[in-house]
Amino acid sequence: MAAYRTELIARDLSAGTECRASVFRLPHAVGGFRISSDDNILFLYDLTVHKDTYRSMFENPYLALYREAHEKYGAKVHLNLFYEFTENDRQYFSTDRPCFDLSTVTDAFKEEFRANADWLKLSFHSRANTMRPYENTTEEEITRECEAVHREILRFAGKEALSDVTTLHFGAANEAAVRAMRAAGYRAMAGYFIPGRPNPVAYHASEELIAHIYERDFFCDTDTDMFFGRIDSVLNCNTNEDNLAEIAEAAASPTRGGYIEVMIHEQYFYPDYVNYLPDFRARVLDPVRYLYEKGYRGRFLSDAVREG
């Protein structure tokens, strides 16, 4: 099967009915890996505070870690952004972090974001850290919140840094939200797709479909024209050793080993966060080193699902 998309049709001639299924061939996905991070906003405040003292945005320790992952192991890094850090968020930090939003972020590092956009991308995640904000949303609401994040990314990082892939907050979204994201230019969304869980992080997929995607790298919902990618390991959920074992299991799978996606959340990087992970650095570098040594190469999810 050489075509990017092949449509299979089964017809019951006696009943006059038919079923259709589309099969996608994704040669650019094979052997690729990506690391993404959700809930990002705090590093942008740090850049803003230090806009007159940092000579490079990679003087920010969080971004410096991802640059190390890229320079040593060729990682492609994707950061999903909140629009605002709110009063509610402050309770999870022991230091007095101020409220702020993306409209106040400096554009002093715009050219550096643009220059590094071949390996570092940004996208919309949610307006703020609220529970499942798009599970029962409207197209108008999510479009408005998405556009607010896009507007600021374009202002402080440039169009080169804006990705057409995201993970929505909590990976929960109704069909209206998915259609709105497709209309906003998004081509793919990542999730956990874990069957049998109250929160499977699977957007609006049925339990049957969740079980199907769980054993695969990608699924394309042809009704909404949206690809969904399976996240193979959430690096802040288990021990680093368990993460590596989980990644090794995915890599060895004939149906999941073609493309590996690992993900973490920004807040676990900071010592003042209530659930701070002192080994955050190892949780980022060890998986990407493992994948690189296994022969995988950094590849954005958008490149993995592209045609041609």
Predicted regions and their residues:
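Active-site-adjacent pocket scaffolds in enzyme catalytic domains
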Residues: 56, 89-101, 160-161, 167-266
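Metal-dependent polysaccharide deacetylase catalytic core of the NodB/CE4 family, i.e.
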Residues: 76-174, 196-200, 266-270
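Well-ordered, non-membrane alpha-helical segments in soluble/globular domains
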Residues: 51-66, 95-109, 139-152, 240-249, ...
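Loop/turn elements at helix/coil->beta-strand transitions in domains of secreted/extracellular proteins
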Residues: 30-31, 71-78, 115-121, 159-164, ...
